[in-house]
Amino acid sequence: RGFWLLVMGFYVCGFQIQFINNHLENYLDGTIVGGAMAATAIALIGLFNMFGTQTAGVIGDKLRKKYLLANLYMARSVIFLIFFIVPVSKVSVIIFACSVGFLWLATVPLTSGIVAQIFGPRYLATLYGVVFLSHQLGSFTSVWLGGIIRTQTGSYDYAWYMIIVAGFVAALLHWPIDEQPIVRPVAAS
């Protein structure tokens, strides 16, 4: 059960980050800062991602990964919500990009760490591949739905609501995950 909760949570990771990656420019183009500011934002996201991912890996060695993931998804949604309700300016875009960048792929060492911790290194590649597939499906879904929402309504408002709510749902999904390693019987000689 915990594995499938992790799969669903990582779906949300892809769902959130690819919406930003693919629709931020168009979203900002409709504001006073213009779409060109999105290039700066994506660059800052990439820069802060390096530090956030490294930090998550280090902290994940010391604290329970499932709780770190739950808090990470919740923090992302809070950042998205604040960015969505605060008037857009160059300063708000820079603060948003740095904040969300720090959390951008910080999910990866924690998610792969849970898979390794539960199933062991022998099954890590295959099982993390399944988890990563869900990330890609989430990516596709948010990019596609974001485009449909923008086309149908002329606004990204409902898409922002979607990624915000999805993050809170992902936070809840991680709480019941059992991180204990699976005990396998030792084969007799």
Where do the model's predicted regions map?
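Loop-to-transmembrane helix entry/capping segments in MFS-fold secondary transporters
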Residues: 35-36, 121-130
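Extracytoplasmic gate region of multi-pass secondary transporters
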Residues: 1-58, 108, 142
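Cytoplasm-facing, short amphipathic helices at loop-to-helix transitions on the intracellular side
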Residues: 3, 65, 121-125
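C-terminal transmembrane helical hairpin of 12-TM major facilitator-type secondary transporters
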Residues: 19, 43-49, 53-114
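Paired intracellular helix-loop junctions of major facilitator superfamily
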Residues: 115-124, 154
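Small/hydrophobic positions within alpha-helical transmembrane segments
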Residues: 12, 44, 48, 75, ...
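Multi-pass alpha-helical transporter architecture, strongest
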Residues: 164-189
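Interfacial helix-cap and linker-helix signal at transmembrane-aqueous boundaries
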Residues: 28-29, 59-60, 145-154
